[in-house]
Structure formats: C-alpha cells, structure tokens
C-alpha cells in the first residue's frame, strides 16, 4: 500500500472529508430522531440492530454484545434488563453450554426494528451517492 504524505492532501480531500463527516453525522442524528419517534432510546435501536445483524457464527452473549457496542459488561446488562422489561428482547440459556446466556429479539422488538431499518434504508438512498463520492475522492490513488 502506498504511503500518503502531507503533500498528498488536497483541498478536494478536505472538502470530501468534511462532506463525508457531515453526511454521517446527519444520518446518525436522523436515526436517533427516528428511534425516539418509534418510542426507543437511540441506544436501544443500536442494540436491536446489532443483535439482529451480528456476524454469522457470533453468539449473542452479553460479552459479545458489550464488545460490539463499545460498552462495559455491566452497562450492557443494565441495557438488556431495561429492554427485556419493555418486551423488546429476552434471555435464553444455551442448550450446549448451560452457563451461557444468549440475548434474543422478540417479535415486538423485531417489528419496531424492521420499520426503523426500512426508513434508514430510504435515507441512505438519498445520502449514499454523496457518501460514495466523498469516499471515492478520499481513496483514489494519487497520480504524480
């Protein structure tokens, strides 16, 4: 991979990075607003999305979820407790390893998540081309 030096940074790069950051921040702000409108705290929306979208083969344990969320174990347990009380998720013991507890999404949680993801996809259709253009500007090979 070629090394990029300070001399390789152009005005286009600054503009592209600024635009990229603006669009990403705007997307997350709108996502948080949509979550609140749906009756969720934004962190609960992120949790449901993470839970439903875990990589194949990754077990939905508190430890794995905490790591993926960037939270401490006890903070994740508190989040799971609150969401379980609302009927969005539930805990289930592993059949193979009885000491493992998995977190699962309920039909109620899945229904809310599905609506939110559908609206987020529509927003990405609008913002996507701008994000792609900015990424292309930032990642194109320097020709000198």
What are these regions (language model features)?
Residues 1-38, 86-88:
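N-terminal leader segment of winged-helix/HTH proteins
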Residues 29-72:
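N-terminal helix-turn-helix DNA-binding core of bacterial DNA-binding proteins
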Residues 62, 80-81:
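Short, hydrophobic-biased segments on the C-terminal half of alpha helices
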Residues 81-139:
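Charged, amphipathic alpha-helical coiled-coil/dimerization segments
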């Amino acid at each position: 991979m070629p090394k990029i030096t300070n001399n390789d940074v152009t005005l286009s790069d600054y503009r592209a990075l600024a635009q990229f950051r603006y669009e990403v921040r705007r997307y997350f702000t709108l996502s948080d607003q949509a979550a609140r409108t749906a009756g969720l705290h934004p962190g609960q929306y992120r949790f449901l999305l993470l839970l439903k979208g875990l990589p194949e083969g990754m077990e939905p344990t508190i430890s794995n979820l905490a790591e993926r969320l960037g939270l401490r174990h006890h903070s994740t347990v508190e989040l799971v407790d609150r969401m379980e009380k609302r009927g969005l998720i539930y805990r289930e013991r592993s059949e193979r390893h009885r000491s493992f507890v998995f977190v699962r999404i309920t039909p109620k949680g899945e229904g809310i998540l599905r609506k939110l993801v559908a609206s987020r996809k529509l927003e990405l259709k609008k913002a996507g081309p701008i994000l792609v253009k900015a990424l292309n500007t930032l990642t194109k090979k320097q020709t000198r």
